[in-house]
């Protein structure tokens, strides 16, 4: 659906508590041309308590980031409620309905995908992978989560490297954020 990026979020339960990490590559393409290799597609929101990443049209994603952060502020950082309220707006607002982007969002309690159709999805295994390299990153993250003791951040790093080796729209310049 979206070319030009891979976003991956992993949550891991450890004896010390829940680890949550999100990462993305930095490649931006315009058709078949790489126009930027160091874009920052993941960030912390709501006073550093929520992680978010986007795949899709950049301007559309920034619009969603702004609206999602406003919902987080309005609902005191409650991730699920903010996501649902954003998707309600998404489905009823004529401008939002035309936005071509997906968001991956996570806090200490939940990880969610907010789709371009206005859906909110919570993955069962705590792994979110979106964008053109998402399937590669998802498979790598599942294997690493199930068969290693790597931290969530290290799983994100390794899985993004694997996706970057396989997906022509994903590069090796990664930004990784953790909670």
From Swiss-Prot:
Regulation: Allosterically activated by HslU binding.
InterPro entries: ATP-dep_Prtase_HsIV_su (IPR022281), Ntn_hydrolases_N (IPR029055), Proteasome_sua/b (IPR001353), Proteasome_suB-type (IPR023333)
Protein localization: Cytoplasm
A Pfam entry, by short name: Proteasome
The UniProt record lists the keyword Protease: yes
Cross-referenced SUPFAM superfamilies: N-terminal nucleophile aminohydrolases (Ntn hydrolases) (SSF56235)
Entry EC number(s): 3.4.25.2
Residues forming the catalytic site: 5
Matches recorded under NCBIfam families: ATP_dep_HslV (TIGR03692), PRK05456.1 (NF003964)
Oligomeric form and interacting partners: A double ring-shaped homohexamer of HslV is capped on each side by a ring-shaped HslU homohexamer. The assembly of the HslU/HslV complex is dependent on binding of ATP.
Protein name: ATP-dependent protease subunit HslV
Gene: hslV
